[in-house]
């Protein structure tokens, strides 16, 4: 590829909400992929985006599972509070998706799902039903076409 290809893409950082220093998400635009949202390590998505074609978004925990894990002694209360202040719950993820125009979205990829506090299958199925979009759960080796058109 030539040097001119560099100008065919844009990467725009945006602030997220996490307990780390200067957390960021990214809106990436490329002529082949269109608009791609990447948002993880945030308990809330403070921005909405136009022209999305593909989304990678954290869907870390289910509040009921998290609470049950505290009640049953699997995790301490302090960890529950940290999770709530630094990660996107299933319901907040769903709200963030619904706040955006999903008309042109081809893929939603759920990332950073907690093994102990989440339910990947329920998250995938619930978000697919609510959005009418193709939803994937990120896992090693997963390959997805991120073209801006589905074919």
Regions from the PLM with identified roles:
Residues 50-141:
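Cap/insert and terminal regions of metallo-dependent hydrolase folds
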Residues 141-147:
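Long, positively charged, glycine-interspersed low-complexity recognition regions
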Residues 2-7:
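Short, small-residue-biased leader/transition segments that mark boundaries at the very start
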Residues 1, 42-44, 140:
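Short, polar loop motifs at secondary-structure junctions
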Residues 150:
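Catalytic phosphate/metal-binding cores of nucleic-acid and nucleotide-processing enzymes, i.e., regions
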Residues 8-62:
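Catalytic core of the metallo-beta-lactamase
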């Amino acid at each position: 590829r030539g040097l001119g290809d560099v100008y065919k893409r844009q990467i725009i950082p945006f602030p997220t909400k996490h307990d780390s220093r200067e957390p960021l998400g990214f809106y990436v635009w490329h002529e082949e992929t269109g608009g791609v949202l990447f948002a993880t390590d945030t308990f809330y998505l403070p921005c909405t985006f136009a022209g999305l074609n593909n989304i990678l978004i954290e869907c870390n925990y289910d509040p009921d599972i998290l609470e049950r894990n505290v009640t049953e002694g699997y995790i301490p209360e302090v960890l529950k509070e940290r999770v709530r202040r630094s990660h996107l719950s299933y319901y907040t993820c769903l709200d963030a998706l619904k706040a955006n125009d999903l008309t042109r979205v081809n893929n939603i990829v759920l990332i950073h799902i907690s093994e102990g506090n989440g339910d990947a299958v329920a998250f995938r199925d619930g978000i697919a039903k609510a959005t009418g979009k193709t939803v994937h759960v990120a896992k090693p080796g997963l390959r997805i076409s991120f073209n801006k058109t589905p074919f």
